């Protein structure tokens, strides 16, 4: 009697089949459930990755070298002469929203229908997690297309049909400016980042004086930077570091946050947010608005 396949081999086979299923063009006569969403249990990975390790990453030399067309095919400029510095087609609009450390993509999926005409990208360093998210996004797109064909309707169940979200593998601490031009972004999300509790690990926190300056460069005046954590000490760390950058950011009032639908999605749609809710933990939210540049800048 043959032995059952090893768990690692089983996971690899599942992931390969899931990726192939969403790449193929959907059959018009196929039911909506023909393409299924991937299962997380087959994309296991450690909770965190060391940002200082020498990961083998692909990143553009500059924002003008970034190939966004492969991520947002529905928004590719139809004019074939409109190409970037590496010869790939430009988009009809720029990416405006970034989810740093996007994980399994709960925030992106939650925001997709809320901001259907806004291009959003998640940045994640873990390979298996990113593979899951991209397979999930492709599956959601195919499901929307199948539903349209089934109902003969031109309106997707979710506005935009998830064509406005994607994810890339990147180390934000090293390569964030390589992807985005000055004042390109309208929103940046940092949801439940690794708190790095030990003092000697604080240099690995995604909120710091140096990184905040990079976020301010990419964020347009009036743009918002959203943060949420379930660690109170880290929340105070965030407040302190943005308070020290008072020339660049100002904190958004609680009254404004209550009216912001993005805050509701950030608190309830992310996988970490759901876990904190199940465990009856606290969620500490702080949102900061990018100030106008001085006239001499």
Curated annotation (Swiss-Prot):
<keyword id="KW-0539">Nucleus</keyword>
<feature type="active site">
    <location>
        <position position="194"/>
    </location>
</feature>
<feature type="binding site">
    <location>
        <position position="101"/>
    </location>
    <ligand>
        <name>S-adenosyl-L-methionine</name>
    </ligand>
</feature>
<dbReference type="InterPro" id="IPR029063">
    <property type="entry name" value="SAM-dependent_MTases_sf"/>
</dbReference>
<keyword id="KW-0808">Transferase</keyword>
<feature type="binding site">
    <location>
        <begin position="270"/>
        <end position="272"/>
    </location>
    <ligand>
        <name>S-adenosyl-L-methionine</name>
    </ligand>
</feature>
<dbReference type="InterPro" id="IPR003358">
    <property type="entry name" value="tRNA_(Gua-N-7)_MeTrfase_Trmb"/>
</dbReference>
<keyword id="KW-0949">S-adenosyl-L-methionine</keyword>
<keyword id="KW-0694">RNA-binding</keyword>
<dbReference type="GO" id="GO:0008176">
    <property type="term" value="F:tRNA (guanine(46)-N7)-methyltransferase activity"/>
</dbReference>
<keyword id="KW-0489">Methyltransferase</keyword>
<comment type="function">
    <text>Catalyzes the formation of N(7)-methylguanine at position 46 (m7G46) in tRNA.</text>
</comment>
<dbReference type="GO" id="GO:0005634">
    <property type="term" value="C:nucleus"/>
</dbReference>
<feature type="binding site">
    <location>
        <position position="191"/>
    </location>
    <ligand>
        <name>S-adenosyl-L-methionine</name>
    </ligand>
</feature>
<keyword id="KW-0820">tRNA-binding</keyword>
<protein>
    <recommendedName>
        <fullName>tRNA (guanine-N(7)-)-methyltransferase</fullName>
        <ecNumber>2.1.1.33</ecNumber>
    </recommendedName>
</protein>
<comment type="pathway">
    <text>tRNA modification; N(7)-methylguanine-tRNA biosynthesis.</text>
</comment>
<feature type="binding site">
    <location>
        <begin position="124"/>
        <end position="125"/>
    </location>
    <ligand>
        <name>S-adenosyl-L-methionine</name>
    </ligand>
</feature>
<dbReference type="Pfam" id="PF02390">
    <property type="entry name" value="Methyltransf_4"/>
</dbReference>
<dbReference type="InterPro" id="IPR025763">
    <property type="entry name" value="Trm8_euk"/>
</dbReference>
<keyword id="KW-0819">tRNA processing</keyword>
<comment type="subunit">
    <text>Forms a complex with trm82.</text>
</comment>
<dbReference type="GO" id="GO:0043527">
    <property type="term" value="C:tRNA methyltransferase complex"/>
</dbReference>
<feature type="binding site">
    <location>
        <begin position="171"/>
        <end position="172"/>
    </location>
    <ligand>
        <name>S-adenosyl-L-methionine</name>
    </ligand>
</feature>
<comment type="similarity">
    <text>Belongs to the class I-like SAM-binding methyltransferase superfamily. TrmB family.</text>
</comment>
<dbReference type="GO" id="GO:0000049">
    <property type="term" value="F:tRNA binding"/>
</dbReference>
């Amino acid at each position: 009697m043959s032995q059952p396949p090893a768990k690692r081999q089983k996971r690899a086979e599942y992931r390969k089949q899931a990726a192939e299923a969403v790449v193929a063009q959907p059959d018009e006569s196929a039911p909506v459930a023909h393409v299924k969403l991937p299962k997380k249990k087959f994309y296991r990975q450690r909770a965190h990755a060391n940002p200082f390790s020498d990961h083998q990453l692909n990143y553009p030399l500059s924002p003008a070298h970034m190939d966004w067309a492969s991520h947002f095919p529905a928004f590719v400029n139809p004019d074939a002469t409109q190409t970037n510095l590496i010869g790939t087609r430009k988009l009809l609009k720029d990416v405006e929203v970034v989810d740093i450390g996007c994980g399994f993509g709960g925030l992106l999926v939650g925001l997709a229908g809320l901001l259907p005409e806004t291009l959003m990208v998640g940045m994640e360093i873990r390979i298996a997690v990113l593979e899951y998210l991209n397979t999930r996004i492709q599956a959601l797109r195919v499901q929307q297309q199948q539903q349209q064909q089934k109902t003969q309707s031109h309106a997707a169940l979710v506005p935009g049909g998830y064509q406005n979200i994607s994810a890339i593998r990147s180390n934000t601490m090293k390569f964030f400016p390589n992807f985005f031009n000055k004042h390109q972004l309208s929103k940046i999300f940092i949801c439940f980042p690794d708190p790095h509790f030990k003092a000697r690990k604080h240099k690995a926190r995604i909120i710091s004086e140096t990184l905040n300056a990079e976020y301010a460069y990419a964020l347009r005046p009036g743009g918002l930077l959203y943060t949420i954590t379930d660690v109170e000490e880290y929340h105070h760390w965030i407040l302190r570091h943005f308070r020290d950058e008072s020339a660049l950011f100002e904190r958004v009032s609680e009254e404004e946050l209550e009216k912001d639908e993005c805050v509701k999605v950030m608190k309830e749609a992310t996988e970490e947010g759901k876990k904190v809710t199940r465990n009856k933990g606290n969620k500490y939210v702080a949102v900061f608005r990018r100030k106008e540049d001085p006239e001499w800048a």
